[in-house]
UniProtKB/Swiss-Prot annotation:
Residues 261-272, 297-306, 631-653, 679-691, 983-992, 1005-1026 have a biased composition (Polar residues). PANTHER family: ANKYRIN REPEAT DOMAIN 36-RELATED (PTHR24147), ANKYRIN REPEAT DOMAIN-CONTAINING PROTEIN 36C (PTHR24147:SF71). Gene3D superfamilies: Ankyrin repeat-containing domain (1.25.40.20). The gene is ANKRD36C. This is Ankyrin repeat domain-containing protein 36C.
Length: 1778
């Protein structure tokens, strides 16, 4: 078992009482399982197959009602599941919890098992005890793939029981947002209701989940559904005091009412946005602006946004997603943002405007709210039918201004004020009323809600700021201004949606908002819900608007004090600073046929996080298109916020796009996506953009200005991009500008971005990814970056323009950052051109305190047919990290092509950031390329790949690229300026490469310059690189990998590098130029270095010439304190027919650690003299040069670069090439003979060494084979050990089964004893009853005797009376006496019956005695059994002890095996050490070879000192020979040592053979012991059978006892009846006694009276003789009556006889019981005999155990012998090692 069992498994009751999701695993124990279940549980496939072959029931259940398939699915065994399913087992059987194998597999996340079951027809809709299906558990586990599989195999998404939730409700109750979204996509019933009538929305509201509420509202859930109690979701929200959710639902209901009631209503609002749209046919404008996505966190915020959009479209135009101004938060202390975009659109037919503006996504929390505004808000929010009621113009203006656009999280009912008194706090009210939805993912805590409630309860004037009162006329202009408390930033988004910026004085303007739509939402992968709240406006017109905020000093003490309640409302807010941000975009679009403009501007995605922020955004955009045009994603200005203490962003962008036919502009602007985190941020963005296209053009993602935030103390960013594009037919402009992707993270940042883009295309041109100005932010103390790209492109047919600029991707982290980015890019193409990835300004952030970066790229491209222009510039990819960084990047690129040209990856100026304290980088580069047919320009410039880590870096990069191509030309990978980082104190790098290429047919220029690959790591670095390259080819030329200037970093204190290589190449047909220059490969590592490298290379090829790897400038860095190297090589070569120039220049590869003695491989004598003069002027540094650095990168073929400097043949060839290059002066006979001799000696020595190495390798292989044999033997031993373990496990299992059987027997004995006690108690109760009856009958007997005596006396008296005259009276008395006699006879009968009962009682007592005797016998038997059990338990304990000893011995054997393994590892280590020594010898050879090469190089460079160098070489060769001899002796010694080791190994092998023989003997002994164990096991099985027989006998005893109990119950019933009859008789007897006593008294009286009258009778005898006769007749009658009484007595006697017969029957039954007792006694005697036999068997087992002990002792002795042998072998090995 892999899983460990817990200490206590949950019982079935615990599992059923839980929620069903706890305790998913089965509590599996060995005694629960049967044969097939054990095979599955122990993962034994072979055993399972064997069990299935024996026709075992495959669906059999274990003791917990689980099938084998349940266990296989629960333990995750797909092979077992496949086997069981193939044998046709039932798939839908249930366990105790009614769970099928499929449910169990899904619950335990066993996807493979579940898929197998589904593929074979398992039912996914079966419910368990809790009413859940497999889909419920998949939702609970958030397993989307499993859910899709279940749904694909027919699972019902709504299946559940009556009391259980469906899967959608389960996801809501578990707060799983991703699952809710997924189920809604899978078309789950959103309006489903549970058993209480509650919908999913009600559940989400009760849980307080804003994200889920938004999702449900976006999918149009029924808000008006009531539960059983008649409550709505809104009621639950109000009861929970969750204002956010309540206002969401209320806003949704309000929009529903507006949709139903009002289609259009002219409203004059205070923010004064204007939108004009006229459409011709089926036009749609949707999602124009989603200004704010996330919240703004600052102390004081003033934002003005005045966008204007103008557009005209004729047919099928659509404008969607115009602006998403703010996506993320702006976190700062005090922020004043002004956003003034203008958007105008005009269409003729059937235009539709949807989702124009969703101003607010997240909530804003501020201190004060304007009373009049709040009054309007309260009135509108608490009045559902506010639209239908009449309202005044002023009230309606305020309500439409604040309610229809903004969402208010806080309300207060305050007494109304006049408009004049209202003006000053209007800004505060609007700030507080802004509702930002980015916080939806956060649950509303009690603490936050308590704070909010406290803040609401406070009076209005507690946190009011000291602001001068203004007149009522300024109210209209002031409504667009937002403020917050200390620590939050707010910007008003949908202020002046179209066009004209409001003046600072504030003028009134009319606004006609359209009908706002319902929720539209997009879900991201990272955060499941990127919450947006979208709205739309049909016609919005407004003028310009601006506002001013008071500084921090004007605030009151309550505001400035952080301990006040106003400051405590936001916990995450930093201390307030100063921020001034202005955003003034303008946009105009005109389209004729089927135009669509979507996602025009997403101004701000994430807000700046700073103390004070004043942002002004003024973009302008104009677009005109004819047919099927679409403008999308023009500008994504800022994605992540400005994170600084004080931020003043000013963003002024203007776009003008004119489309004629089929142009689509998507995602025009996503202004700001990240916030700036700093103290003070001032950003200005003013990008203009113009584009014109004819047919099916699409502009995607024109500008994404800022993605990440500006994280700095003070940030002033001005972004002024301009984009103009004109296309005729089917053009597409996409992703024009992504201005800033990541924010600027610094203390003070001032960024100005003014890119201009103009593109004109004719047919199907595409310009994509023109500029991504800044990808990562500038992380520094002070950063000033200016980016001014300009792009112009014109194409005729099928052009596409996409991804023009991405100004900033990551944030700039510094205290003071000033960034200005004006870029201009122009591209013109005729047919099917595409410009992709023109500029990526900054990718990573600049981490400095002061960074001033200026980027001025310019790109111009013109192409005729099917050109593609992509990846033109990537200005900065990674950030600059320094205290002061000034980077200026104005690249210019011009490309013209006729047919199928493509320009890709033109410039990537900076990839990684510059990380230093002071960095000033300027990069001006120029590149021009012209090609005729099928040319491609790819990867023209990569400015910097890794960052520059210096204290002071001033880098200037000014690349220029111009390319012109006629037919199918492509120039790839022209320039990669900087790849790796520059790490130094102060770095000033200037890179000015120029590239010009012209080709006619199928030319390709790729990888032109790669200026800097690795960073410069030094204290102060100033690098200037000026590279110019011109190449012209006619047919099928390819230029690739032209320049890789710097690959590795320069690591020194101060570096100033100036590199000015020039390369010109011209070829006619099928020429290829590749890898022209790699300037620096490894870094320069020194304290202060100023390298200047100026190389010019000109190569002219005519036919089928291939130039590969022409120049790898510098492959190694300089490691010294101070170096000033200059390399000025030039290369001129002309090859006419099918020649190849290989390995032209390899300047430096590895690190240089010497004085500037440079290698000049292709230089003239004049150049050498210049170098010598320069070297004499340079200071001397004690360092050396490795000549290997110049010869490692020489290339042997025309296509591949070989940097191998190991083989001597290559070195010889290289030396010969060097001699040829240095003309005839080096070709002396003497020198050549010496060189040849040295080569021959080296070859011979290497051959000898190779032979020795081969011999050593053979020996090593033999040793490895021996080691493998030893390992096999060890593995065999381990298998034997594993078998022993398996056997011990089986013995343990049997012991466990025996213990379990003993426990069961003990339980049964306890039950028997309890039954005996119950029987005894019943017998005692019956005895007591009999005793009580006997006591009652004793006093009755004398009464009966007295009654008989009285009867006799009465008879005598009656005879006497008969004799007298009074016979009549006596006759009457006689009758009475006869009745009494009959009664007495009945009493006699009862007495007889009592006597009989006494006899029966005696018999019962006898039976009881016998029963007690039997119980005593049973007790004796039990005692004997207990004794036998104790004996067996002792034996079992002894066996367990023996097992433990065996285990310990096995562990010892394991340890010995491990020791052997460790020894083998030590041998391996030694072998590895020998190999390392061999490798060291090789390395020494290589070192000698390198020294030899150094001498050869010195001979080439210094012709005058050849003789001295030859002497030095001879000395070095003698030293090498001596070293070789020493090495040979060492090899000889090692060979002898290896021989000794081989002998030792042979000895060890012999010992191992002896051990194997001993192991075989042990195995034989073990087999014999195993046979005895099998016999013992058979006897134990017999013992188990006897126990089973005893169990059967005990069951029979129980049955007999049950029968006896039934009979006793019958007897007791009879006795109860008899007792009842006796009691009745006794009562009658008492009554008769009383009557007889009374009669006796009467008789005595009558006798006395008769005596008195005797005399009278005697006297009257004669008179009464007649009377006597009459009396005689009466006596006859009395006799007749006596006969009748006799008959009655006979009947009573018969009844007594019947009773006697019943008693006889009972006696017979008692006899039967006695016989049964006798049988039970016989069975007990048989059991006693069996126990005696078992005792004999136990004695035999003891004897066998003794034998086993002896065998185990023998094995122990053998193991000890083995251990001794192992110890001896270890000692031998130690001796061998010593």
């Amino acid at each position: 078992m892999d899983d460990k069992e817990p200490k206590r498994w949950p019982t079935l009751r615990d599992r059923l009482c839980s929620d069903g999701f706890l305790f998913p695993q089965y509590p599996i124990k060995p005694y629960h399982l049967k044969g097939i279940h054990r095979a599955v549980f122990y993962r034994d496939l072979e055993e399972l197959k064997f069990v299935l072959l024996t026709r075992y029931d495959i669906n059999k259940r274990d003791r917990k009602e689980r099938t084998a398939l349940h266990l296989a699915c629960a333990t995750g065994q797909p092979e077992m599941v496949h086997l069981l399913v193939s044998r046709r087992c039932e798939l839908n059987l249930c366990d105790r919890e009614d769970r099928t194998p499929l449910i169990k597999a899904v619950q335990l996340r066993q996807e493979a098992c579940a898929t197998l079951l589904l593929q074979n027809g398992a039912d996914p809709n079966i419910t368990d005890v809790f009413g859940r299906t497999a889909l419920h558990y998949a939702v609970y586990n958030e397993d989307t793939s499993m859910i899709e599989k279940l749904l694909s195999y027919g699972a019902n998404i709504e299946e559940c029981s009556e009391d259980e939730y469906p899967p959608l409700f389960l996801a809501v109750s578990q707060r799983k947002v991703k699952m809710v979204e997924f189920l809604l996509k899978k078309k789950a019933n959103i309006n489903a209701v549970d058993y209480l009538g509650r919908s999913a929305l009600i559940h989400a509201v009760t849980l307080g989940e804003k994200d889920i509420v938004i999702l449900l509202l976006q999918h149009n859930i029924d808000v008006f559904s009531r539960d059983v109690y008649g409550k709505l979701a809104e009621d639950y929200a109000s009861e929970a005091k969750n204002r956010v959710i309540f206002e969401l639902i209320y806003e949704y209901e309000r929009k529903k009412h507006e949709e139903l009631s009002i289609n259009s209503n002219p409203v004059s609002s205070q923010k004064q946005p204007a939108l004009k749209a006229t459409s011709g046919k089926e036009d749609s404008i949707s999602n124009i602006a989603t200004e704010i996505k996330d919240g703004q966190k600052s102390g004081t915020v003033s934002s003005q946004k005045q966008p204007a959009l103008k557009g005209t479209s004729d047919k099928n135009d659509s404008v969607s997603n115009t602006a998403t101004e703010i996506k993320d938060e702006q976190k700062s202390g005090t922020v004043s943002s002004q956003k003034q975009p203008a958007l105008k659109d005009t269409s003729d037919k059937n235009d539709s405007v949807s989702n124009t503006a969703t101003e607010i996504k997240d909530e804003q929390k501020s201190g004060t709210v304007l009373p009049a505004v709040e009054q309007c808000l309260n009135r509108s929010l608490y009045r559902p039918d506010a639209v239908a009621q009449p309202v005044t113009e002023d009230e309606f203006a305020l309500e439409s201004e604040i309610i229809s656009k903004l969402y208010i999280p806080k309300r207060k009912i305050i007494s109304p004020r006049s408009i004049e008194d209202v003006l000053p706090p209007v800004e505060e009210a609007v700030d507080r009323c802004l509702y930002l939805l980015d916080r939806f993912a956060q649950a509303v805590t009690k603490d936050k809600f308590a704070l909010e409630s406290e803040n609401i309860s406070e009076p209005y004037f507690t946190n009011r700021r000291t602001i001068s009162q203004q007149s009522a006329e300024k109210l209209d202009a002031a409504c667009g201004i937002d403020k917050t408390e200390n620590g939050t930033l707010f910007e008003d988004q949908n202020v002046d949606k179209e066009g004209k910026a409001l003046p600072a004085t504030g003028q009134k303007a009319n606004v006609s908002p359209e009908q706002p739509p319902l929720f539209t939402h997009t879900v991201k992968d990272s955060d499941h819900i990127s919450t947006r709240f979208l709205g739309s406006m049909d016609s919005l017109t407004s003028s310009e608007e601006s506002s001013e905020r008071p500084p921090l000093s004007t605030l009151t003490l309550k505001e400035a004090d952080p301990s006040s309640k106003a400051a405590m409302r936001r916990k995450d807010s930093p201390p307030p600073g100063k921020v001034s941000s202005q955003k003034q975009p303008a946009e105009k679009a005109t389209s004729d046929d089927k135009d669509s403009v979507s996602n025009i501007a997403t101004e701000i995605k994430e807000g700046p996080i700073s103390g004070t922020v004043s942002s002004q955004k003024q973009p302008a955009e104009k677009a005109t298109s004819d047919e099927k045009d679409s403008v999308s994603n023009i500008a994504t200005e800022i994605k992540e916020g400005q994170q600084s203490g004080t931020v003043s962003p000013q963003k002024q962008s203007a776009w003008k796009v004119i489309f004629k036919k089929k142009v689509s502009l998507l995602n025009i602007a996503t202004r700001i996506t990240g916030g700036g985190k700093s103290g003070t941020v001032s950003s200005q963005k003013q990008p203009p953009s113009k584009a014109t296209s004819d047919k099916t053009d699409s502009a995607l993602n024109i500008a994404t200005e800022i993605k990440d935030g500006l994280q700095c103390g003070t940030v002033s960013s001005q972004k002024q991009p301009a984009l103009k594009a004109t296309t005729d037919e089917e053009d597409s402009v996409s992703n024009i500008a992504t201005e800033i992707k990541d924010g600027e993270k610094s203390g003070t940042v001032s960024s100005q971005k003014q890119p201009a883009l103009k593109a004109t295309t004719d047919e199907e041109d595409s310009v994509s990814i023109i500029a991504t100005e800044i990808k990562d932010g500038e992380k520094s103390g002070t950063v000033s970056s200016r980016k001014k790209p300009a792009l112009k492109a014109t194409s005729d047919e099928k052009d596409s323009f996409s991804n023009i600029t991405r100004e900033k991707k990551d944030g700039e982290i510094s205290r003071t950052v000033t960034s200005e980015k004006p870029a201009g890019l122009k591209a013109t193409s005729d047919e099917e051109d595409s410009v992709l990835n023109i500029a990526r300004g900054k990718e990573d952030g600049e981490k400095t305190r002061r960074v001033s970066s200026r980027k001025k790229p310019a790109l111009k491209a013109t192409s005729d047919e099917k050109d593609s222009f992509s990846n033109i510039t990537r200005e900065k990819k990674d950030g600059e990290t320094s205290r002061t960084v000034s980077s200026q990047k104005p690249p210019a690129l011009k490309a013209t092509s006729d047919e199928e040209d493509s320009v890709l990856n033109i410039a990537r100026e900076k990839k990684d950031g510059e990380k230093s304290r002071t960095v000033s980088s300027e990069k001006p580069s120029g590149l021009k390329a012209t090609s005729d047919e099928k040319d491609s320009v790819l990867n023209i410039a990569r400015g910097k790949k890794h960052g520059e880590k210096t204290r002071r870096v001033s880098s200037h990069k000014q690349p220029a690229l111009k390319a012109t191509s006629d037919k199918e030309n492509s120039v790839p990978n022209m320039a990669t300026e900087t790849k790796d980082e520059q790490i130094s104190g102060t770095v000033s790098s200037q890179k000015q490469p120029a590239l010009k290429a012209t080709s006619d047919k199928k030319d390709s220029v790729s990888n032109i310059p790669t200026e800097i690959k690795d960073g410069q790591q030094s204290g102060t670095v100033s690098s200037q690189k000026q590279l110019a390259w011109k190449a012209t080819s006619v047919k099928k030329d390819s230029v690739s990998n032209i320049a890789t200037e710097i690959k590795d970093g320069q690591i020194r204190g101060t570096v100033s590098s100036q590199r000015q290589p020039a390369l010109k190449a011209t070829g006619d047909e099928k020429d290829s130029v590749s890898n022209i220059a790699r300037e620096i490969k490894d870094g320069e590592k020194s304290g202060t270095v100023s390298p200047q490298k100026q190389s010019a290379q000109k190569v002219i090829f005519k036919k089928k010439v291939s130039l590969l790897n022409i120049a790898t400038r510098i492959t190694g860095g300089w490691k010294s304190g101070t170096e000033y190297p200059e390399n000025l090589p030039t290369l001129k070569a002309t090859i006419e027919n099918k020649n190849s120039v290989l390995n032209t220049a390899t300047k430096m590869k590895d690190v240089q650690t010497s004085t500037p003695e440079q290698d000049l491989e292709m230089a003239s004598e004049g150049e050498q003299k210049r170098l010598e003069e320069y070297e004499n002027n340079q200071p001397q540094v004690k360092n050396q040069i490795h000549s290997r650095d110049d010869l490692d990168d020489i290339i042997q073929s025309s296509q591949t670069v070989s940097e191998d400097g190991d083989s001597l043949c290559c070195n010889c060839k290289n030396v010969i090439l060097l001699i040829d290059q240095h003309e005839m002066k080096c070709k002396d006979c003497v020198h050549l003979l010496k060189i040849k001799k040295t080569f021959c000696l080296c070859k011979r020595l290497t051959e000898l060494k190779d032979n020795h190495c081969e011999q050593l390798r053979v020996k090593i292989r033999k040793l490895k084979n021996k080691a493998s044999v030893l390992q096999k033997r060890l593995s065999e031993k381990e298998e034997i050990k594993s078998q022993l373990k398996h056997e011990t496990l089986e013995l343990e299992k049997e012991l466990c089964s025996l213990r379990f059987a003993i426990q069961q027997e003990k339980k049964k004995r306890r039950n028997v004893e309890e039954l005996h006690q119950k029987v005894r108690e019943k017998l005692r109760i019956t005895e007591e009853q009999y005793r009580i009856e006997a006591d009652v009958t004793k006093p009755i007997k004398p009464a009966l005797k007295s009654a008989e005596v009285e009867l006799k006396t009465g008879g005598n008296n009656s005879n006497q009376v008969s004799e007298t005259d009074e016979k009549e009276d006596l006759l009457h008395e006689n009758r009475l006496m006869q009745d009494e006699i009959a009664r007495l006879r009945l009493e006699k009968d009862t007495i007889k019956n009592q006597n009989l009962e006494k006899k029966y009682l005696k018999d019962f007592e006898i039976v009881k005695r016998k029963h007690e005797d039997l119980q005593k016998a049973l007790k004796r038997n039990e005692e004997t059994l207990a004794e036998t059990i104790a004996c067996y338990s002792g034996q079992l304990a002894a066996l367990t002890d023996e097992n433990t000893t065996l285990r310990s011995k096995l562990e010892k054997q394991r340890e010995s095996g491990q020791r052997l393994e460790t020894e083998m590892q030590s041998y391996r280590c030694r072998l590895n050490a020998a190999l390392c020594d061999h490798d060291q010898s090789h390395s020494s050879k290589r070192d000698q070879e390198l020294a030899f090469q150094g001498t050869v190089d010195k001979c080439c460079h210094l012709q005058e000192n050849l003789n001295s160098h030859v002497l030095i070489l001879s000395l070095q060769l003698s030293k090498a020979e001596s070293k070789f001899r020493v090495l040979e002796t060492e090899l000889h010694y090692t060979g002898e040592a290896l021989k000794e080791k081989a002998l030792v190994f042979e000895h060890v092998q012999s010992e191992l053979k002896q051990k194997q023989s001993q192991m075989k003997d042990i195995e034989k002994m073990y087999k014999s012991g195993y046979n005895t164990m099998e016999k013992c096991i058979e006897k134990q099985e017999r013992f188990c059978q006897l126990k089973k027989q005893n169990m059967l006998l005990q069951q029979q005893l129980d049955d007999a006892r049950n029968k006896a109990d039934n009979q006793e119950k019958a007897i007791l019933n009879i006795q109860a009846r008899c007792d009842a009859r006796v009691e009745n008789l006794q009562a009658e007897c008492r009554k008769h006694r009383l009557l007889l006593e009374e009669d006796n008294k009467m008789l005595v009286n009558e006798l006395n009276h008769s005596k008195e009258k005797k005399c009278q009778y005697e006297k009257e005898k004669a008179e009464r003789e007649v009377a006597v006769r009459q009396l005689q007749q009466k006596q006859d009658d009395v006799l007749n009556k006596r006969s009748a009484t006799k008959a009655l007595l006979d009947a009573s006697s018969r009844h007594c006889i019947y009773l006697e017969n019943g008693m006889q029957d009972s006696r017979k039954k008692l006899d039967q019981m006695r016989s049964q007792f006798q049988e039970i006694q016989d069975q007990l005697t048989a059991t006693i005999r069996c126990t005696k036999e078992m005792e004999g068997d136990a004695q035999k087992l003891e004897v066998e155990n003794v034998m086993m002990r002896k065998i185990i002792k023998k094995q122990d002795e053998q193991i000890e012998r083995f251990e001794k042998i192992l110890q001896h072998s270890s000692l031998m090995l130690q001796v061998f090692e010593s």
